[in-house]
C-alpha cells in the first residue's frame, strides 16, 4: 500500500507537469487521510500554471521608484516665451506622455514643476506657494536661461536671477528658448536621477 504522499505525487503527476512544491506530508485531511488539496482541481491547475514560469522579485523601494518614473505628473508654470516650447513638447510630434509624463493643472496632483521663463520678484512668492502645495517627493525643472540665471534680463531690478533662489532645482535646461527636444532630454535626465536616488522621501 502506498503512502498518502505517494498518492499526492501520483495525482499531481497525472494532472500533467511536475509539481512546484513538495508534498504536504504533515497537513492531512482527517476525513480522507490524504494531504489537504490532493485531487483538488483548483490546486492542481495552479500547480500546473506555476510549474514552468518564473517569478519577478524586487525590493519595494525599487518597485516604487520604477512606478514613479513612469507616472510623473507635471505642473505647468509658464512665465514667458519658454512656455511655448513647453507646450510643444506635449504635442503629437514629441508626445511626452509616451514616457508617462502628463500635465496637471493642480499642484496637489503634481510631481514635477517646470519653471519656463523669466521669474520676476512679484511672481516669486506665487512660485514658492505652488511648490509648497506639491506633495513629496517633488521635483523642479528650470527651463531656459531666464529661469536658470536671469538670462537676458539678468541686470533688471525686477527679475530674480535664477529660480534656484526660491525653490530647489533638480534639472537645468539651458537655451533661449530651449527647444522641445532639450526639454524632453531634461525630462529623461530627471527620470534617470529618480531611478538613481530612489528615495521615497526627500
UniProtKB/Swiss-Prot annotation:
Alphabetized Pfam families for the sequence: Oxidored_q6 (PF01058)
UniProt entry tagged with the keyword 4Fe-4S: yes
Known partners and oligomeric status: NDH-1 is composed of 14 different subunits. Subunits NuoB, C, D, E, F, and G constitute the peripheral sector of the complex.
Disordered, as annotated region: 1-32
E.C. number(s) listed in UniProt: 7.1.1.-
GO (cellular component) term, any one: respiratory chain complex I
HAMAP family in the cross-refs: NDH1_NuoB (MF_01356)
Protein name: NADH-quinone oxidoreductase subunit B
Taxonomy, superkingdom: Bacteria
Catalysed reaction, written as an equation: a quinone + NADH + 5 H(+)(in) = a quinol + NAD(+) + 4 H(+)(out)
InterPro entries per record: NADH_UbQ_OxRdtase-like_20kDa, NADH_UQ_OxRdtase_20Kd_su
Molecular-function annotations in GO: 4 iron, 4 sulfur cluster binding; iron ion binding; NADH dehydrogenase (ubiquinone) activity; NADH:ubiquinone reductase (non-electrogenic) activity; quinone binding
Enzyme class: translocase
Compartments where found: Cell inner membrane
Ranges annotated as biased composition (Polar residues): 1-13
Residues that coordinate or bind [4Fe-4S] cluster: 81-82, 146, 176
Membrane topology: Peripheral membrane protein
UniProt KW keywords: 4Fe-4S, Cell inner membrane, Cell membrane, Iron, Iron-sulfur, Membrane, Metal-binding, NAD, Quinone, Translocase, Transport, Ubiquinone
Keyword ATP-binding: no
Co-factor remark: Binds 1 [4Fe-4S] cluster.
Record function comment: NDH-1 shuttles electrons from NADH, via FMN and iron-sulfur (Fe-S) centers, to quinones in the respiratory chain. The immediate electron acceptor for the enzyme in this species is believed to be ubiquinone. Couples the redox reaction to proton translocation (for every two electrons transferred, four hydrogen ions are translocated across the cytoplasmic membrane), and thus conserves the redox energy in a proton gradient.
NCBIfam families: nuoB_fam, PRK06411.1
A biological-process GO annotation: electron transport coupled proton transport
Cofactor: [4Fe-4S] cluster
Record family assignment: Belongs to the complex I 20 kDa subunit family.
